[in-house]
């Protein structure tokens, strides 16, 4: 089942099922698809300007790193990402840029899902957003990101989504 839906979605479905069985409110299902051509998610891309992962030299223990990835995948509220960021800083020190990017991506995903956005794609700085089955355009065309670096693009992307839903 995990390979069919992906680890993150599987964890969320499991979390929702447990909440339903306990009679609790079911958490949001965060299934927004992100396709960001300026982000590199593999540890093998270390040193790349858009790398987003948890480096071994930041969290040496493999189990701890996997637990961090799991918490990111299971997060359904922006507060959870903020709490994880604070916990990581308290336990391991200042976040490396790659970890900060990874958390920013998770935040964007949750923010998008909260507002019914199914797809957020950035291709050659062109921003493609799909909500309620329709593409969101600015004056009959897709918006473009103006920032030149990955961190600036992530910030601009988050701000654009916040403005879109305001």
Locate each region found by the language model.
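Accessory helical-bundle/CTD segments and flexible terminal tails appended to RecA-like ATPase motors
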Residues: 1-166
């Amino acid at each position: 089942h995990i390979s069919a839906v992906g680890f993150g979605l599987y964890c969320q479905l499991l979390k929702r099922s447990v909440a339903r069985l306990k009679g609790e409110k079911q958490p949001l299902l965060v299934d927004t698809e992100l396709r960001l051509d300026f982000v590199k998610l593999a540890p093998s891309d270390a040193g790349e300007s858009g790398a987003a992962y948890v480096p071994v030299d930041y969290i040496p223990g493999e189990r701890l790193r996997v637990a961090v990835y799991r918490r990111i995948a299971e997060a359904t509220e922006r507060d959870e990402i903020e709490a994880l960021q604070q916990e990581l800083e308290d336990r391991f020190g200042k976040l490396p840029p790659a970890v900060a990017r990874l958390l920013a991506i998770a935040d964007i995903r949750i923010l998008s899902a909260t507002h019914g956005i199914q797809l957020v794609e950035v291709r050659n700085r062109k921003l493609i957003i799909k909500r309620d089955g329709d593409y969101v355009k600015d004056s009959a065309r897709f918006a473009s990101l103006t920032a030149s670096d990955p961190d600036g693009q992530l910030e601009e992307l988050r701000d654009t989504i916040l403005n879109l839903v305001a």
